[in-house]
Amino acid sequence: MSASRSRNKQSKLCDDERLDISKDEFNRFQEAFGQEEFRKLFFDYVDEIQDPENRKIYEAEITQLEKERGVEVRFIHPKPGFVIKTALDGELKCFINIASSEEIERPKNEVATDPSSGSRGLNWSIPMAQTTSRDDFDAKNNHCKVFDVVFHPDALHLAMRNKQFRQCLIDTALDAVEREYKVSLDRANLKFPKLDYKGIPRPTVIRKMSDNPTAEEQEPHPLAHMFPTKPPAPGKPEPRVLPMKTKPTPVPEFTVPRYTIKHSHDVDLSEYTDELDAKLHVTVPRSLVVEIELPLLRSTAECQLDVTSKSVYLFSERQGAKYRLKLDLPFIVDDKAGRARFDTDMRRLSITLPVVRKSVQEQAQMHETLRHFSREDSGVELHSNSESPVEEDPDGELSDSKADISKTSSPTVVRNANSPFLKSSVHYQLPSKFDCNVLDNVMAFVLHVPNVQPDSIEQLREQRSLHLKFATIGSGYYPTHYAFYVELSADHEDSAIESAEAEAWDNNVVLKLYLNSQSETPAGYLAGLDATELKEYPVHGQYHVKSKEKVNAKKENAPLDVEFERNQEGHALKVTIRPGTKEEEEEEEDKENQDQKPESDQQQQQQVQNKKSGKKQRKRNKKERSLSESACADMVLQEPLAKSNELQPRATFKLPPQRKQRSYSESNDSTGRSHRGILKRFSRYGPRPSMSDSCSSIDDSSSYSCSVDASGASLFSQSFGGIPEEDRSDAGLSESCKKTVRFNDHIMKQVFRLDSSILGQRKKNQKRRDLKLRAQQRRLSEGDSVDYEETRGSALKQKENPSRNCTDSGLDLTGAAGAHSNNNESDAKNAMMFEMDD
């Protein structure tokens, strides 16, 4: 922008046309001026032009030529008067020559009355003429501009005698230059050097139509009367009269110099990345460059400069160069690290001031704010009324979660009760939706307000009430202020608030009020914008954390239900041992309470018990499963017995609490069977016991029984250390072997980062599984093909005699030969992979 302004300035001030010369012409001039004869002829030509007698002959010829064309020409030769020195557009030095000539008309005056004041005075009409501007040089060979304004000699004579007329003559000359050349002159710093005329006087020409037309003009033109024309007005044309200003323009005592402010910025490659804060400081420059044009000053010793963090002040009292500038800067600058330089050739003062940027802490906080606003929504809806299994969480995990939340929660500002909490100049509003849940002596409020600034949370806590306020930032970066006042109900006078915590999340604000130990569980509370606008609200949910000791004691004291059933057809004995369920406990409690209730209540309870007993019997029928005699090694039948549909009666009795046990078949080898089941592999190098699926269907015509296979008792105890081995000598217990699955009470939990989404985490886990599977496939290289064939051969041999390694489990395996072959091949591959790992 500065370069274009300088080009416009040069085009405005330099009116002379540029010399357009080719290289050939330049070489010819160079060769000609190298000859002495040509130089002599050239100097004679210059002397002839500058000779006054020759100038008169030239002017007479031009006058005669123009007269033949019907134009009257007058040459004006300016005579020296006095010179005015000032600045042009605040950048360039200029001179205005006040000259005189007899060809200009005399000034005229007439008596006039001022309409505003009614005073009588003289109304002057001062004719003048102007010449074209020209470039020149001052005493120090610096570029300057020269203008000529020519008056009648009588006007200069009156100016020398009357001070007011002199000032009127100066104002007329300045107005003429500004109006004609569209420039601005510095009227506050006018100087009058001891010069009569600046430069060499150059005549100018005044042309006007002649009063006596020539003979050629008197002859009618053949095309002149084709169209009607307007007749000329009678009388002589009057010259143009420029009205003078009725009120003089007030001249300021000091001039405001011309200045420019440039924003300097370095090229930083970090701004061209895709980071959130890459373009955070693009609009903030590294430094500010202030350039002040002082064309009337020779050095900075003649002015005073004061720079602060937000402004620049320049002051000069030198006669003829009075400047005063007070400039406000757009950014905060470091005034101690700035530097200034004055260009004596251009008369320009340049001040470079580095811009103060934000500290590292503020930039980090701003980065976190941007990351918070640009975080993707996880897509999980939060339901405040959804009940969570609080009773199942142990005390240890609950205390750990409280400790983690207290560490991660942002600190809130606690205000003094004496100062007004809510500002009168800010409009606060109550959250449109909020919920309350009670967990023992903790009241948890969920205020559904998204995008809450953690730093804006402030609270004012009293004994039975709490006042909370916070602010949010919307999509247009416009803050919205909220306030929430909660007070305990008057029904519970012993309740008091010991402490409070407020934490801002993505979609809501969680407020926790910790009550004292003597307080009862509140059923409601009072809430509103402040203490004057309160409304009673009920508590949505009340939860109590059960003690871990009570839960364990109840589990240990739970009775066991043992049932026996004999089958005469297959000589099988079915033993079912299960702990007492919650339904049975409820039945026992109902029986105890029936003695204290009236007869009508007992009838209703009897109907409920009948329904529950029916459901319990259906569940038992679904879960009960019998095992054949081949499932136990100590029972072998030689002759089949006669079929009978009658069953022995079942007996149900209570046993003392004992740990469940499992039996496994010794005749089955783990290497000959495929490991399919719901239990995972325990070790890559140790034995791998297999368990058949507990949920598989059992066919009556199958010749195999479901069992737990292992290679030996010692190997089985390594993998299933938590399940004790059964006593094989006890035939009753061996017949009661039942396949069960035990689950751990420990609940696994997964913690996700705040800035990650569920879809992104799922993609990451899928990629990890693909890489793991690809790595396992690469392990099967060509060099291990021999081991693979040997292992495959041993597996095929075991396939030929399946009856030797398999026992009757009650499943139909005759139609699954293809599946066995595939399983054996997979076992061979796994065995080979384990050998490679060794």
UniProtKB/Swiss-Prot annotation:
Q: Name one GO molecular function term.
A: protein phosphatase 1 binding
One GO CC annotation, please?
cytoplasm
Region of interest called Disordered, as start-end residue ranges on this chain = 106-125, 212-238, 370-411, 557-696, 776-838
* One matching Pfam family: PIH1
Where does the record place Basic and acidic residues bias?
370-380, 557-572, 789-802
Q: Where in the cell is it found?
A: Cytoplasm
Which parts pass through the membrane? none
- Compositional bias, Polar residues, is annotated for 114-125
Compositionally biased residues, Basic residues? 612-623, 673-683
One example of a Gene Ontology biological process annotation = axonemal dynein complex assembly
Entry keyword Lyase = no
Give the sites modified to Phosphoserine: 378, 781
This chain's function reads: Required for cytoplasmic pre-assembly of axonemal dyneins, thereby playing a central role in motility in cilia and flagella. Involved in pre-assembly of dynein arm complexes in the cytoplasm before intraflagellar transport loads them for the ciliary compartment.
The UniProt entry's sequence similarity note says: Belongs to the PIH1 family. Kintoun subfamily.
What binding partners and quaternary form does the record give? Interacts with Pp1alpha-96A, Pp1-87B, Pp1-13C and flw.
What is the protein name given in its UniProt record? Protein kintoun
Source organism: Drosophila sechellia (Fruit fly)
- By which gene is this protein encoded? Nop17l
